Amino acid sequence: MEIFNVKLNDTSIRIIFCKTLSAFRTENTIVMLKGKAVSNGKPVSTEEIARVVEEKGVSEVIENLDGVFCILIYHFNDLLIGKSIQSGPALFYCKKNMDIFVSDKISDIKFLNPDMTFSLNITMAEHYLSGNRIATQESLITGIYKVNNGEFIKFNNQLKPVLLRDEFSITKKNNSTIDSIIDNIEMMRDNRKIALLFSGGLDSALIFHTLKESGNKFCAYHFFSDESDDSEKYFAKEYCSKYGVDFISVNKNINFNEKLYFNLNPNSPDEIPLIFEQTDEEGEGQPPIDDDLLYLCGHGGDHIFGQNPSELFGIDAYRSHGLMFMHKKIVEFSNLKGKRYKDIIFSNISAFINTSNGCSPAKQEHVSDMKLASAQFFATDYTGKINKLTPFLHKNIIQHYAGLPVFSLFNQHFDRYPVRYEAFQRFGSDIFWKKTKRSSSQLIFRILSGKKDELVNTIKQSGLIEILGINHIELESILYENTTTRLTMELPYILNLYRLAKFIQLQSIDYKG
């Protein structure tokens, strides 16, 4: 723990932080940083940021800062904290009188305030269970606040926060998803070799071809398990061979050992895996444990490009182009997803009646999905160095897809249609039109079946059933069906409930408040 005493408009403030954030201080300026900050295409240190702050001011810095980072800046009467657009190190703060506690870990905030009781934020828990990622700085723990991706927050001399910007208020640079992926990869490049986690699906294929086009050398890792379809591995291997890319397959299988959870220190339920995987070192390839590799993956593509767009897009289609166009898009969607036309129509009519003018439930759901994706994935090694990231979760791509109407994400035959078409036009490979991977639902059902007792016990012991007024009979019925018979529409709720229960357990949260 370190303490900096500063003044905001003659009011004395203490900044208390854990040493996981590297700090640089001059007489009038403090910069604390974790991750990799980039300005004008070049990495910058805390000292370099401080120098620009003193020469040009805080506003100039935050307008031109890119990368994957969280940051605190103090300069004379300005105190700001912020986070990059790209999913990166978390940043939390807690206020106590004229003290502000800052860390990238919720557990550190709790450790620095042993006399405070941190209880479950019931409202945020309900939003989490419903899948609604609302734009707020509140966390799941009362009294602890989070900085969301792309946000910069300024504090006045009473430590009242004011939001200066968020990820959806930033202007995108171009409309090309592929150009943005290239820019994002180049921004994060260092002297390490690149390893692509390549499944052979659309999202990893996008990164595969952008790496090839931009002249980056890389190897491809393909994970498989005893339950995998061998055709997926052979397809990925042959595809890499066709383009002269080294291919390494690694055998990973499910590990149901619940003790592994107690090695976690999660900041949110989304960081808690449904299951752990173990690597078989005697498989066809060695596990990717090389510290000199920067791993790229296609995580987030499903959410951002609209893998499962909200069926309430019909409201937007009707408002934009009329009744016949809405009919056409609903027919396309029902054919693509195998849903009943009548059900989609009824859900749109019901939502339309209960929706205010100008409100787009489909767009709200899509933006919520993108925020969920950008919050879920980011990894550093034990030194804090970035070792795994996804090039999709960045402002140009997020901004572009936030600006598209949901009904434009697909046509009758292909989901994620705009990105498939752009990639095919640019690279000429038919991989972008293929469904190369099997559905993950079989694997999820196997995991839930194997964890049935643990799932039930964790949820019951968390206290969530009582505190949130959950009907335990209905819950038991839903749990039974999803773990023994088939997956249902309640699957996302079940997964969120389990992760939230685990989060309460691992963070020792007083759910009773």
From Swiss-Prot:
Keyword match Cell membrane: no
Keywords from the named record: Antibiotic biosynthesis, Cytoplasm, Plasmid
Principal location: cytoplasm
Top-level division of the source organism's lineage: Bacteria
One of the GO biological process terms: asparagine biosynthetic process
Transmembrane segments: none
Coiled coil feature spans: none
GO-annotated cellular components: cytoplasm
Residue span(s) of domain Asparagine synthetase: 176-436
InterPro entries to which the protein is assigned, alphabetical: Asn_synthase (IPR001962), Rossmann-like_a/b/a_fold (IPR014729)
UniProt key word Cytoplasm: yes
Compartmental location: Cytoplasm
Molecular function in Gene Ontology: asparagine synthase (glutamine-hydrolyzing) activity
Entries under Pfam families matching the protein: Asn_synthase
Function, as annotated: Along with McjB, necessary and sufficient to process the inactive microcin J25 (McjA) precursor into the active peptide.
Record-given protein name: Microcin J25-processing protein McjC
Species annotation: Escherichia coli
